[in-house]
Amino acid sequence: AETIYGIPVESLVKDASGKICGIRAGEDEISAEVVILCDGVNSLLAKDAVGYDKPPASQVAVGVKEVFMLDEKTVSDRLLCADGEGAAWLFVGDATHGVFGGGFMYTNRESISLGVVTGIEACASGKGKPVYQMLEDLKNHPSVAPLIHDAKVVEHSGHMVPEGGVNIMPPL
C-alpha cells in the first residue's frame, strides 16, 4: 500500500464496469486497487462515486479553532500541568450560548488550542450567535481569558464535523 499526501484529487477513475480503480489529479492518473476518500463530510468525490448527496444540516456541525502560542513553561504553569503532561477541557452551555454544541481547549507543548463546535442547523436558523462570535465570547470568558492572555494567535481553522454517526456515511 502507498499513501500519497498533498495532492488535490479532482476526480475518480472508473473502469468499464463502473468500479473505482484510481484517481485523477491534474494531468496525472494514478491507479489503485483501493481508494479511500478523505475529503470531509461534504465529499464531492463521494457524490461522484456513488451519487451520495450532502448530509442533512441536522447531522452536521461546524467547528472553529484558534491556536495560541506561548512558551512551554507558561502553558504548564497556567494549566497546572506536570512536566511532559497536558490538559484538555470541555465546555458546554455558555460556550455555544445554549444551542447544540460545546467548546474545547487542549494544550500542546508550546501552545493552547481553543475552539467551539455547534450544529449547522442552529447557525443557519439564526437561533444562536454566529460560530465566530461564540469563539470570541469563549476567548473572553473569565475562566479562559487569563489562560490565553498575551498569547499570539498562530493558527485559525474551521471544519465541518459529522454528527450523524455511521448513518450518514455514503453506501459502499
Question: Where does each model-flagged region fall?
Answer:
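Central beta-strand plus flanking loop segment that forms part of the substrate or channel wall
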Residues: 50-85
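Active-site substrate-recognition segment that forms the wall
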Residues: 85-121
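A conserved short coil-to-beta-strand element within the FAD-binding core of flavoproteins
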Residues: 5-19
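Core beta-strand elements of the Rossmann-like FAD/NAD(P) dinucleotide-binding domain
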Residues: 25-34
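FAD/FMN-dependent oxidoreductases across multiple families
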Residues: 97-99, 122-172
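N-terminal Rossmann-like dinucleotide/flavin-binding domain of flavoprotein oxidoreductases
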Residues: 1-2
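Flavin (primarily FAD) binding-site architecture
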Residues: 37-52
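Hydrophobic residues embedded in beta-strands of well-ordered beta-sheets
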Residues: 19-21, 112-113
